[in-house]
Structure formats: C-alpha cells, structure tokens
From Swiss-Prot:
All copies of domain Asparagine synthetase, residue ranges: 251-639
Record protein name field: Amidase chry2
NCBIfam families the UniProt entry points to: asn_synth_AEB
InterPro entries (alphabetical): Asn_synth_AEB, Asn_synthase, ASN_synthetase/amidase, AsnB_N, GATase_2_dom, Ntn_hydrolases_N, Rossmann-like_a/b/a_fold
Family in the record: Belongs to the asparagine synthetase family.
Function per UniProt: Amidase; part of the gene cluster that mediates the biosynthesis of the yellow pigment chrysogine. Pyruvic acid and anthranilic acid are likely substrates for the nonribosomal peptide synthetase chry1/NRPS14, with pyruvic acid adenylated by the first A domain and anthranilic acid by the second. If pyruvic acid and anthranilic acid are merged and released from chry1/NRPS14 by hydrolysis, a subsequent amidation would lead to 2-pyruvoylaminobenzamide. This process is probably catalyzed by the amidotransferase chry2 using glutamine as amino donor.
Keyword entries, A-Z: ATP-binding, Glutamine amidotransferase, Hydrolase, Nucleotide-binding
Pathway(s) per entry: Pigment biosynthesis
Pfam families: Asn_synthase, GATase_7
Domain (Glutamine amidotransferase type-2): residue spans on this chain: 2-220
Superkingdom of this protein's organism: Eukaryota
C-alpha cells in the first residue's frame, strides 16, 4: 500500500529536451507532490525521470510484502525501457513469478513486481490477470505510451488532470497542487451529480480513472479511458439448476479463499470488527484459518488468541454503538479485541481531517470513527487490516434493494410466494422507502430513461445522499435531475441489459457498485482514511473471483421475504455460508446500517464545529450554495432533530473544508 504521483508532457506539445531550469522545476514539483501524500508511504520514497524529463514517476512506500530495499519503487525491466509505480496488494503473485521466471528477471520478493512482467508477456490484456486492490502507472519508453489503471471496484483511488501541458496522475487529488493546479468547482457536475457516476469530479478538469478501467496516453493522441472488466449478471429468465446447498458451499469456499490470500504479509495483520455479519464472518474465517495452519501476517503463533480485532465504541445512547455485539463475537472466537472509544468530542476533532483525506463529502460521521480505528491500529505497530466492505452491495444488504427485489418475479428460482403476495410486498416496500420523489419527467427525458427508472427504484435512493441547497444562479446549468444523470451515465450495453436481461435487484446492485460504493464508501470508509495512519485495508468481499460467483446467485437467495409474517432476511445465502464461523446472535440478527451517531443537540461539540465552518462568509465563498436554505438546514438539524437537515448541513460543512484546504476559487456563473 503506497502512494503514487506521475506526469508526462502532454501529447501535442513540444517533446524536445527540457532545459536545465525546467528540469529542476519538474523534479521539485514531483517531489512536492509526494510530500502531499507522504502519509501514505513512510518507509521509502523513489523517483524516476526520462532522459528528457518529459516523464516522471514518483512513489512513497508502505512496505507490507518484502520489507527489503528490493521492494522499493519505481520498478524497471532489465532493459530499462519499461517503468512502473504501483499502489496496493496483488495476490497470486508467487504463481505468476514462477510462471514468468524464464523470461523476466525479478529483483526481489515484492508482489507488485509482476506488473511489468505481465505487461511484457500479455500486452495490454495483462490487467485482467491482476487480482487484488491496486492502482498503477506504467511508462513504456519503447512504445511511448503511458498506462494508468485502477482495480475492478475502485478500492484504490486514481485521479488525473491536464495542467500546463502535462498529464498528471496521482493517488490523491491534493498531489496536483504541487504542480500549480488552482482548483475550481465544477458546478455542473455538482448540480447534476455526474461526479457520482462518471469520470468527472467536483473539480473542473480533474477526473477519476474509473474502477475496472485503464487510462492510456500515446504520442499525438488525447488520453482515453477503456474498460478492462465489468460486472455481469445472468439472464433473468434463465433457470438456475443448482441446489441451495451447492450455491452455499460455492460462496463459502470462495470467501474463505479470498480471506486466506489476504492474510499473507511480512508485517502484523489485524481485523476491523463491528457488530454486523460482514466483519464478523471475516473475523470468524480468519480464526478458522489460523486453526488450520494459515499464518496471520508475520505472526508465528497458530492460536486464535494471537489475532487482534479493533472496534469503534460509540456512546451507548448514540444508537450507533455495536461494541457489545463485537465483544461477544470476539469472546466466541477466543480472539483479542480492542475498543476505540468515540464520543462526540472525538468525532468532531477528526471532522476536518476526515474530509480532507477522503476528498469526498459523505453526510455521516462513521468516517471519523474509521480514522480513529486506523490511528489505534497504527499505534500498536499493525500495518494491515482485513475489512468487510463490499458485502452489502453484492449479497443484498441495503433496504433500498427491497422494492427492486420484489418488482418482478425471480424466474431463475422456484417461487417463494404467490404473485399476489409479491405485489403486495412490493407496494409496501416502495412506500416504506419513500420512493417516487423523481416527480414528473420533462419532455427532454428520453423514453428509455423513463422506462429504466420505472423498472428500478434505487436510483432515487442514491441520488438523495448528500443533496445540497443550491443557489438560484446554478440553474444556468439546467434543471437537471440527478436520477436521470445516473441512469444515462451507463453505456448502451448496460442500459440494454437493464431493460431486457437483468432482474431489477441486479440492476440496483450494479448501480450501487458503480456509484455509491467507489465514490463514497471506499473513500470515506476505506483506503484514503486508513492510509492517513499507514494502515493497508484488504477487502475479501471485493475479490472478483468471489463476486463473479455471487453475481450469478438467484435474487431469491440474496434477499428473502416471508409473506406470512411480512419479514425480511437480507443476505440469506451469505448467512448460510458463514454460519459455522459466527455466533447465533449474528447469524439471526437483522441487518443494521453501519452509520455514525445521528442525533446531536444545540450547543454540543458538533453544533459548535458546524457553526464555526458554516458561516455566511464561508458559504458565500463556495459560490454555489444558498445561504438562507443553509440556515434553515442548520435549524432543522439541531433544533428540530431532522435527519435530512443534519445530512445536508454536514455536507455543506464538508464542502467548506474542501474549499479551504484545496484553496478553491469561488464559483460563479461567469467563466
């Protein structure tokens, strides 16, 4: 787990050698860009420049596999024509090293060395052979091409922009400040929320390398993104002939393997544990694997008691504390548990840093708890953790999936209820979720978009997250509807599958995986936050060998509705698969969203912090937020205890923090 920053003089501009003064400048710029992400890699730092200084690769290292200098980056091939910087963990690397040993000379034992070897062996198709959490930049001097790629689910972030004739690529946007970038708000992207769907960000001209994509830049061509992988789901009319026991065993085997390969490290490894089934099942499987003889990182003991779990302990009356359940799970497994206490003051003290390092606004406070977890783990000398992200999106853990799971029969599996019962349950689920906020479509909305929205409910659920009170002038960008932006952000193949092939719950899962998960959850509760304290997070539920199998599980085995007592059983097939590894309490417990505290009183620490940030001057300096509506949200959040108002005011405060720390110019209708 590391941080990368790179540049290439942009195609179409002069490729003549850089003069000495300019060469010194680009060296200093790259060095400063690494300073801005130095928290990601305290163990080593490396740089490489082409002879003409038109290309530069920089890397800061957190050493996890191969702690020796031979694992330092950038990596180079033996001929000196191919160079790469890699962030993340690549599994199955030993198999590839053995396979390619005759044609590539490996310098050390680092997993990331296989990137250049696979590229030389397979060409551009090599990315599909990578398994794990990764982002990288590779420069091929012979072909004069730069390749930047990101893992399938966006666990690792990777951004790019063009500034002063250079294509810049980095793990975090803040690195671009070193090259002189002066960020501006992309109000169009903010207003229609396209930054949640496509490659744009809320900064003008700054883009994401999308999950499952690679960026390529060649001489005399503009940089382009291409997909190398995407989610697939079965035809909703195809019968699944497997038994439930067979599918359960298939999930169990693949999840165990995904956990097992993530235990390998030359440093200590721990587990993040909450009260839910996702992290509990991971902890249970780690304990099981230790008993079976699998080493946990560099731990020599094969006793479960050597395993450490870390849990956030919110205030007991906050409605967010799961530490009691986590403690009972730890006792059941016979493992060590460390509780990290988080009261309101502790949350507030981390509010600004969580926003700055995540580089996204998310109207919840669980990211501050995640930052405290990483801090506690780091303090005890642990460099890697196993986490539970990605389970809800694939196994059907969100309430927002309920209506979609019932909007059509599941033709792939024997009926669990009559059609009348299904329709009644669907109507109730739709009402409970308060769908239908989409309103009337304007004549400009294509018929196909209307059809996709009315056959799927989850788009509006995602679009409601973190909505802002926009200033009137922003209407110059049109009265765009975020739900249409989301639907129309998918390519023609996906839209055709949504309309014709996929069950609605699979469409809902696709939308979450492509939008909310990479752009919110994995930034605010994942790598960006963990790496503030030099902790690598590994996500077995996002192992593509597992998810490709789970995506082919019938909807009825993911979300199960009991028409007799009108009850839901979320993640049914996961519960059955992990039953041997969790307590009866966790196995039987209903899904509860993992969120931070949601009620705060006037005059308390959060109210004071928000009041300090959300002033008239600060809001007006954003330029795109209405002050009167913001005042109304402040009143609703703290005086009236309105949940939607709290989320809105938190989002405004986060944008204030981002604007101040990035030095963003005030937005206006004049450009």
């Amino acid at each position: 787990m590391c941080g990368i920053s790179a540049f290439i003089t942009h195609p179409g501009h002069s490729r003549s050698p850089v003069l000495n003064g300019d060469a010194k400048q680009v060296v200093e710029e790259l060095e400063t860009s690494l300073d801005l992400i130095a928290h990601r890699g305290p163990d080593a730092r490396g740089r490489w420049f082409s002879d003409n200084h038109h290309v530069g690769l920089g890397h800061v290292r957190l050493s996890i596999i191969d702690l020796s200098p031979s694992g330092n980056q950038p990596f180079h091939d033996e001929q000196g024509g191919i160079h790469a910087v890699v962030n993340g963990e690549l599994y199955d690397y030993e198999r590839y090293k053995a396979q390619l040993a005759d044609e590539f000379k490996f310098v050390g034992n680092s997993d990331c060395e296989i990137v250049i070897a696979l590229y030389k062996h397979y060409g551009l198709s090599f990315i599909s052979h990578l398994r794990g959490e990764f982002a990288f930049v590779l420069w091929d001097e012979n072909r004069q091409q730069l390749i930047a790629a990101r893992d399938r689910y966006g666990i690792k972030s990777l951004y790019y922009t063009v500034h002063q004739n250079k294509l810049l690529v980095a793990t975090e946007i803040k690195s671009f400040l070193a090259f002189g970038l002066e960020p501006e708000w992309c109000v169009r992207s903010l207003r229609d929320q396209s930054w949640r769907v496509d490659s744009t960000t809320f900064f003008e001209g700054v883009y994401k390398v999308r999950p499952g994509h690679y960026l390529i830049c060649r001489p005399n061509e503009r940089e382009e993104q291409h997909p190398y992988w995407d989610l697939e789901y079965p035809d909703k009319f195809a019968k699944d002939l497997r038994s439930e026991d067979e599918i359960t065993e298939g999930v169990r085997e693949r999840l165990l393997e995904a956990v097992r390969i993530r235990l390998k490290a030359d440093v200590p490894v721990a587990v993040y544990l909450s009260g839910g089934i996702d992290s509990s099942s991971v902890a249970g499987m780690v304990s099981h694997l230790i008993k079976q003889g699998t080493k946990l990182g560099n731990e020599t003991s094969l006793l479960p008691s050597s395993m450490k779990c870390y849990t956030v302990q919110f205030d007991e009356g906050s409605g967010a504390d799961e530490s009691a359940i986590a403690r009972r799970t730890a006792d059941f497994l016979g493992v060590d548990i460390h509780l990290v206490k988080m009261d309101e003051e502790a949350l507030v003290s981390r509010f600004e840093d969580t926003t700055w390092y995540s580089e996204v606004p998310l109207p919840d406070l669980n990211g501050m708890g995640r930052l405290a977890l990483a801090e506690a783990v780091h303090a005890q000398g642990i460099k890697a953790v196993i986490t539970g992200e990605g389970s809800d999106e694939h196994f059907g853990g969100y309430d927002a999936f309920r209506a979609d799971s019932l909007s059509e029969p599941d033709h792939s599996w024997p009926a669990m209820m009559t059609d009348t019962e299904r329709q009644e349950a669907h109507a109730l689920a739709s009402k409970e979720a308060q769908y239908g906020i989409f309103g009337d479509f304007t004549p400009k909305v294509p018929i196909s978009t209307k059809r996709m929205f009315y056959s799927n409910h989850v788009a509006s659920s995602i679009a409601r997250v973190g909505s802002l009170p926009f200033s009137d002038w922003t209407k110059v960008y049109g009265n765009s509807i975020p739900e249409t932006t989301m639907i129309e952000g998918f390519d023609g193949r996906v839209r055709d599958n949504i309309l014709k092939r996929w069950h609605p719950v699979h469409t809902a899962q696709y939308m979450f995986v492509k939008t909310f998960m990479p752009h919110f959850i994995l930034r605010y509760n994942g790598d960006n936050i963990d790496m503030v304290h030099q902790v690598e997070s590994r996500c077995p539920f996002l192992d593509h060998h597992l998810t490709e199998y789970v995506n082919n599980v019938p909807p009825s085995l993911k979300m199960r509705y009991n028409a007799k007592d009108k009850s839901w059983r979320e993640k049914h097939i996961l519960r059955e698969a992990v039953k041997p590894f969790v307590t009866d309490e966790v196995y039987n417990m209903s899904k509860k969203a993992y969120m931070g505290p949601r009620k705060f009183w006037p005059g308390g620490p959060l109210h004071k912090k928000i009041s300090e940030l959300v002033t008239k001057a600060n809001v007006e300096n954003l330029g795109f937020v209405d002050w009167q509506a913001t005042q109304d949200a402040m009143d609703g959040a703290f005086n009236k205890q309105e949940g939607l108002a709290l989320r809105r005011i938190i989002t405004v405060a986060q944008f204030v923090v981002l604007g101040q720390r990035f030095g963003v110019k005030r937005a206006s209708g004049r450009r």
